[in-house]
């Protein structure tokens, strides 16, 4: 088993994390204990920034039904610096700057980390980011240049690839095809940006927030409408 080489200072096995203890309630920020050994395919990352996806809000509110994994850690998009690597890991090394993402990439699929909170197990997925540190599966990490802004890098964990994936992989938009985007948030803006890159036209954005529509035009939206607009189809 690969060690962190931190046994001389047990405090380094403790990190601050946001924990979902009960659905619909505020997250609990508290000390969480990391396991002292990295398992095959796992990577220890020092988290620098984390994004907050709408799906996490839904997860907190249990909009898809009862949460059978409580209590558990959260977050699936972020950036950080690799601290240690487990056995078998070859795609990343100590000191690498990385994006943490929910989609699988190349690399090893590791088991989920086993953390403890108040002496009891706290669950996690293959990647979590609402913590000071995270034990991540190798295939949820992508190395980025060290001079790239880690704050901006979080967008590559979900919003950017999701938006571009919708346009290029799912809808497969072609030159001159029209696009309508409902909701100009992080994903919507990147759908607009990707649509512009493939020369879609028109690119229509619909949102209840006028400021988002204004911002959307910088990303490629050609026509923006408030969702409460009457006779929208005629326009």
What is the predicted role of each segment?
Residues 55-61:
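Cytochrome P450 core scaffold surrounding the K-helix E-X-X-R motif
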Residues 77-79, 97, 133, 178, ...:
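Residue-level marker of beta-strand positions
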Residues 230-235:
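Short amphipathic alpha-helix with an adjacent loop that forms part of the alpha/beta core around
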Residues 146-229:
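Mid-domain Rossmann-like dinucleotide-binding core that forms the NAD(H)/NADP(H) cofactor-binding site
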Residues 33-50, 63-107, 140-148:
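Glycine-rich beta-strand-centered segment in the early N-terminal region that forms part
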Residues 104-182:
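NAD(P)H dinucleotide-binding glycine-rich loop of Rossmann-like/cofactor-binding domains
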Residues 15, 41, 176-177:
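Nucleotide donor/acceptor-binding cores
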């Amino acid at each position: 088993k690969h060690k962190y080489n931190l046994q001389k200072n047990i405090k380094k096995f403790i990190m601050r994390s946001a924990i979902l203890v009960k659905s619909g309630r505020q997250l609990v920020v508290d000390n969480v204990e990391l396991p002292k050994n990295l398992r095959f395919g796992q990577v220890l990352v020092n988290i620098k920034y984390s994004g907050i996806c709408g799906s996490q809000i839904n997860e907190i509110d249990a909009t898809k039904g009862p949460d059978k994994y409580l209590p558990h850690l959260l977050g699936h998009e972020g950036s950080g610096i690799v601290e240690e690597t487990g056995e078998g890991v070859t795609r990343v090394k100590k000191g690498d700057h990385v994006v943490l993402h929910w989609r699988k990439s190349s690399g090893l699929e590791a088991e989920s980390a086993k953390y403890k909170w108040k002496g009891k197990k706290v669950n996690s997925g293959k990647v979590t980011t609402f913590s000071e540190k995270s034990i991540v599966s190798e295939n949820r990490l992508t190395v980025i240049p060290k001079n790239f802004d880690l704050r901006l890098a979080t967008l590559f964990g979900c919003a950017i690839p999701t938006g571009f994936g919708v346009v290029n992989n799912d809808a497969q938009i072609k030159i001159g095809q029209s696009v309508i985007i409902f909701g100009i948030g992080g994903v919507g803006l990147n759908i607009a940006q990707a649509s512009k890159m493939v020369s879609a036209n028109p690119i229509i954005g619909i949102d209840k927030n006028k400021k988002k529509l204004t911002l959307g035009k910088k990303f490629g939206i050609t026509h923006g409408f408030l969702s409460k607009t009457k006779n929208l189809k005629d326009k």
